[in-house]
Amino acid sequence: LAKFGDAEAAIRLIDEVGKGTHLGRILGNGAAFTARAFGIERAPVVKGQAMPAYDPRAIQGIGVTYATSTMGADHTAGYAIATNVLKVGGFVDPLKPEGQVELSRNLQIATAAIDSTGMCLFIAFAVLDQPETFQALLDLLNAFYGLSLTADSVADLGKTILRAEREFNIG
């Protein structure tokens, strides 16, 4: 279809998708579908979702997230880049397995809770680097929605959402 780095070929393939040609419809269905259509056994996908921005071989925390999240290869489901690379909220060595499971789990729980508020995931940076901002966030949500959220109830909310997503995926 195209050699690596061939920008003109890439644009032609995107045009195929836009035109809705047979090839374009295959490509437009994503990496997993395209691989199956062409008989390719190995494609950079997890749970049918194409590999996003970060390579899990170099950042093990994001690899754990890809493998365990309800969405597959979604770096925003548990943004381990924050702690593995940017050192936000601490540091877990991205090249060592120690601490990756706990990091990914905690970030997935927090992300599910944040997503449910309609706020951008990146508010987590402020909370991770300045823990006192977490209470300010709770105060804001409680005032806006008329709730009585606590740190524990937010964690429970994230866990409940992840359980519901898993049940949906199974059902």
Question: What are the language-model segments listed below?
Answer:
Residues 2-171:
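Extended C-terminal regions of large enzymes
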